[in-house]
Amino acid sequence: MINATAKANEDWKDMLKEYNIDETLLNKNLNSAEFKNKAGNVKDDGNKCYTLKNSDIHGKGLFINREVQKNEVIGYALSNNERTYLGRYTNHSPEYNAKFLAIKNSSDMITVAYKKIKIGEEILVNYRNHTFKKEYYNKNLI
């Protein structure tokens, strides 16, 4: 039986193939000084509902400090065109427990629990539902 971490990593690679995104090029872009400069300027929204920790899925992740109910707003992923910790450190999984929702007539985006999230669980979204638009990524990679 495949564990959740391996399943999330396998699904990530499958998704890159589906969207025709070159993983080497993507990693080069993500590791560039320009990206790290931008990524380093992440707005801490002061939300005490989660903690930033090392993730078995990828790098850093956000872990719940208190039980979160289905459809509860966890916080902003994007606020005034600035990414927050939720926008930067929420990892991908096909077995997701949260969603990003755009706020109508705004550039803001919130993170909402898709199902009940227990203390200690990592906040996960399915990137297929949100961020990957192959036209954008294929033309904007270094």
Annotate each language-model stretch with its function.
Residues 1-142:
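Conserved catalytic SET/PR domain of SAM-dependent protein methyltransferases, capturing the structural core
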